[in-house]
């Protein structure tokens, strides 16, 4: 419940910051900390260096992090101009949050946190020790989680169960699943059922993502 409240508050801030409908834009940050906000069009936001915050709104947007600890926020797509997102982290320890549609999230290098949100998402950890979460606990669309290199934790658990696909890759990986999930044989440890849900909550809480996301909004007035 706490996570849901924080997510709703974050998306409200994104909408308030956006203003009216605008044409698609391309924004490129600096080597310092930047806050880049999209429009209702198909935008491209590029973070470059620094600890950046990239906000997507409606439209088929592409968000690219750079060096530093970046936040890539998929926004709320439940609008006539909504669209799938392509969110790609950079070389730092990034937080990547999908929107309402079918998004592709990539952590890239670094120890990243990725939360797909609603929709049929594809979530890729890349290098590093990543925490990948499909963002839905009450059924819904089917997601694909791919860990990549590193010691990853992947949480496709849902109730009621739905058929998510999980592949692990290099490293020693942990999958916290429900009974409908399809887990590849390269995954070293797999937990299923209520114990998996409890462990997933613990990993998410310890990551501090839903607390630190508001620290990442510190440079919000820029744009």
Residue ranges and their predicted role:
Residues 1-4, 9:
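Positively charged n-region of N-terminal signal peptides that target proteins for export
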Residues 8-17:
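Bacterial N-terminal signal peptides
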Residues 20-26:
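Sec/Tat signal peptide C-region and signal peptidase I cleavage site
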Residues 29-32, 38, 47-49, 55-56, ...:
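Glycine-centered beta-turn/loop sites at beta-strand termini
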Residues 38-41, 223:
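Extracytoplasmic low-complexity repetitive segments enriched in small/polar residues
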Residues 156-199:
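Leucine-rich solenoid repeat scaffolds
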Residues 199-223:
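Composition-driven, intrinsically disordered low-complexity tracts enriched in small residues
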């Amino acid at each position: 419940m706490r996570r849901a409240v924080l997510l709703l508050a974050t998306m409200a801030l994104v909408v308030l910051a956006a203003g009216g409908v605008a044409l698609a834009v391309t924004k490129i940050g600096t080597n310092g900390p930047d806050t880049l906000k999209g429009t209702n069009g198909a935008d491209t936001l590029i973070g470059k260096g620094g600890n950046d915050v990239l906000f997507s709104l409606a439209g088929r947007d592409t968000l690219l992090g750079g060096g530093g600890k970046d936040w890539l926020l998929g926004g709320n797509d439940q609008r006539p101009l909504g669209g799938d997102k392509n969110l790609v982290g950079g070389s730092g320890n990034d937080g990547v949050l999908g929107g309402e549609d079918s998004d592709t999230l990539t952590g890239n290098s670094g120890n990243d946190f990725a939360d797909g949100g609603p929709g049929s998402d594809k979530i890729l950890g890349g290098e590093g020790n990543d925490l990948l979460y499909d963002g839905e606990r009450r059924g819904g669309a089917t997601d694909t989680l791919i860990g990549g290199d590193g010691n990853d934790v992947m949480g496709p658990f849902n109730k009621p169960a739905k058929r998510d696909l999980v592949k692990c890759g290099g490293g020693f990986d942990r999958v916290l699943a429900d009974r409908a999930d399809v887990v590849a044989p390269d995954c070293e440890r797999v937990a299923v059922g209520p114990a998996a849900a409890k462990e997933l909550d613990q990993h998410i809480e310890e990551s501090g993502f839903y607390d630190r996301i508001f620290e990442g909004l510190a440079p919000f007035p820029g744009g």
